[in-house]
Every structure is written in C-alpha cells, then in structure tokens.
Regions:
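Non-catalytic connector elements of ABC transporters
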Residues: 30-34, 41-158
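Internal alpha/beta loop-helix hairpins
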Residues: 1-54
C-alpha cells in the first residue's frame, strides 16, 4: 500500500487472517465486503449493529474484540461474499436490499445487491429464482466476520 509492505505471510493466512483492511480487500475474488458498523457492549455482551440489523458476537470473538477495541466504537466489518447468505425472514437478516445483478458462473452465482449499507456482493450456489430488481434479505456467517479499526484499518478481530 503506497509502497509499504502490509503483511508477510502465507496466502492462506493473508486470506483468513489479514493484518488490516487493505490486505483483506486485496486478496480474494470477489473482494471482501466492507460495512461501517457500531461495536456495542451491552449487559456484558458484544453486539455488532449495522443500519438495518444487529447480531450478538459469540463469547470467543467477544473476548478478542474486548482486547483490541474501544468500548462502543465505530468499526469496519469485513465479510467475504461466500459468507453473506440469503435468508427468508427480515427478522433473521443483517442486510435487506435489492438485487442489481445476478451473475451465473456455472454451479455458483454472484449476487450484486444494493443495501442501505452500500453495495454488497454474495457468492451462492446458482439458483434461477433470483432476479434483478427483486428484494432480498441476507444474514452473515458470524464465524467468518472480520473487524477493522475505522481510523487505522488495523485488524480488531479475524
């Protein structure tokens, strides 16, 4: 990044455990989704809150976040497209949006979706029931979230 080495590691580790937001966005195709969120501690639990949804972080990740994050701070949530999963119910979802593009690639497909949080990309099994212009809800595979400091871009948790 601007001629400065960001991380020296194996491709596996850079993909799964990026040192910062730059590395996370550089590796992987399609690229990682980035969303501004609030990290909130309430009644001893850590919650991630986006514009239209929130979820409680599991205990292991909550401890990791407590070590690195300031209490009640804004952060950047990173989630790879394969971990953004369509769901039926708005109540179960973190994002709601409208499909811009359905890109079939054989057995897999890429959904490009416009949400209140910006453009989100999801990589799914091909399914011809998805159409451009249709509403869609997504949940996140929470075991695969990344959090980055909003100012420095450094990893808070992988």
């Amino acid at each position: 990044n601007n001629g400065e080495i960001q991380q020296i590691d194996t491709p596996y580790n850079m993909f799964h455990y990026p040192a910062n937001q730059f590395v996370a966005g550089f590796i992987g195709m399609p690229g990682m989704n980035f969303i501004e969120v609030d990290v909130i501690e309430k009644d001893g639990e850590i919650w991630i809150k986006g514009k239209n949804g929130s979820f409680k972080v599991n205990a292991e990740r909550a401890n990791e976040i407590r070590k690195q994050a300031k209490q009640n701070q804004k952060a950047i949530l990173g989630i790879r497209p394969e971990h953004v999963v369509p769901c039926e119910n708005v109540e179960d979802s973190f994002f709601q949006g409208t499909i811009d593009v359905y890109e079939m690639l054989g057995y897999t497909a890429i959904l490009h979706v416009q949400t209140d949080d910006g453009k989100i990309v999801s990589s799914i099994e091909e399914n011809d029931s998805y159409k451009a212009g249709a509403p869609i809800n997504f949940r996140l595979n929470e075991d695969h979230i990344h959090l980055f400091d909003i100012e420095s871009g450094k990893t808070i948790c992988n």
